[in-house]
A protein has these predicted regions:
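Positively charged, amphipathic and often flexible ligand-engagement surfaces
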Residues: 234-236
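Helix-loop elements that line ligand-binding/catalytic pockets
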Residues: 244-245
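Extended hydrophobic-aromatic, low-complexity segments
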Residues: 240-241
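Catalytic alpha-helical scaffold of carbohydrate-active enzymes acting on polysaccharides/glycoconjugates
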Residues: 1-160, 165-231, 249-271, 278-321
Length: 321
């Protein structure tokens, strides 16, 4: 039987993933708390042998604004809605990690890179949105080239990519492969995402699925698409939501049942979240993650489940042919 695999990935973006919809003052506590939680997560991963992919926005590789600007593409994303572009923020946010810790994160990049089993991946250079009107595949390619260039000049070879908000269309997968990526994380492949297009209902069903098995078990066999491995996200680890706090036990039970199903059937289960998701109520979230990864230890012992980061999983799959 195939070996079962647990993949963990994190969308490492600081405030760049929120700047188009939030004021920093509204979310700063979460971002700064997420920064403080990263060493705790790395220690948790070390204790349980968890190999994870940290998909970082390219801006985080820069030590300061001057260094970052040298990598700005000549062709920037042409979104119809200009607030979507992070480039508009420069000049008003501070120039380095000391003055703008919600926007710069080079010290965290170095911390992650030094930890065993942790892979640095890409969350695009500018937190690029592939489904927004006005942008083009050529602009997307320019963004990816910038992301790989700033990382390569600092000794990092990025081969795994997670697209912001999981926005991917078929014409973008060959662009990712041509840019040098071998793995990406697509959005959950279930009936909610495929058939429900009315956004209020979609949000309700996605929230309910956190606690109840509306969409099945989430395990799968990864596929190669145009030379790039699609490592679909199985489950986002959702942060504590106070109005439904009494259902937290169901949330953890749901994740563990999905992990068990994957372990028993030789499938891949891909768990993901953002560091800022655990930036408030951090100790509660760390206790929950400890419970999840202690359960992984049991599945490893009983069923031989493995922990691989996205790059490791993709290499294994591509080498098998």
């Amino acid at each position: 039987m195939r070996e079962s695999t647990l993949i963990v990935s994190l969308d490492f973006e600081l405030f760049w993933g929120m700047q188009d919809g939030w004021e920093l003052s509204e979310y700063e506590e979460n971002i700064l708390g997420g920064r403080a939680a990263i060493p705790k997560m790395l220690e948790l991963f070390r204790r349980h042998g968890i190999h994870a992919t940290w998909a970082a926005v390219g801006y985080l590789f820069g030590r300061n604004e001057g260094e970052l600007r040298r990598y700005f593409p000549t062709e920037l994303p042409g979104y119809d809605d200009p607030k979507l572009s992070g480039y508009r923020c420069f000049g008003s946010i501070g120039t380095d990690e000391g003055s703008a810790p919600c926007y710069y994160g080079r010290s965290l990049i170095d911390l992650i890179a030094a930890a065993e089993g942790q892979e640095l991946g890409s969350h695009t250079f500018s937190h690029y949105y592939c489904r927004e009107p006005g942008q083009t595949t050529a602009q997307f390619r320019a963004d990816l080239d910038a992301a790989r260039a700033i990382a390569a000049d600092q000794g990092f070879d990025l081969t795994s990519i997670i697209l912001p908000r999981n926005q991917c269309e078929p014409e973008y997968t060959p662009v990712m492969r041509e840019a040098g990526f071998t793995a990406y994380r697509d959005e959950e492949n279930d009936w909610i995402h495929e058939k429900i297009h009315f956004k209020p209902l979609l949000r309700i069903l996605r929230l309910a699925d956190v606690y109840l098995p509306l969409t099945g078990q989430g395990g799968y066999i990864p596929k190669v698409e145009n030379g790039i491995v699609n490592l679909v996200g199985s489950r986002m680890y959702k942060p504590f939501f106070k109005p439904l706090g009494f259902l937290e036990g169901l949330k953890l039970r749901r994740i563990k049942k999905q992990m068990l199903h994957a372990a028993k059937n030789g499938l891949t289960f891909h768990l993901w979240w953002h560091p800022h998701n655990v930036g408030v109520r951090t100790e509660l979230h760390m206790q929950q993650l400890e419970e999840i990864f202690s359960y992984y230890d049991e599945l490893k012992e009983k069923y031989g489940m493995r922990s691989l980061n996205m790059g490791e999983a993709a290499r294994e799959i591509l080498n098998r042919g």
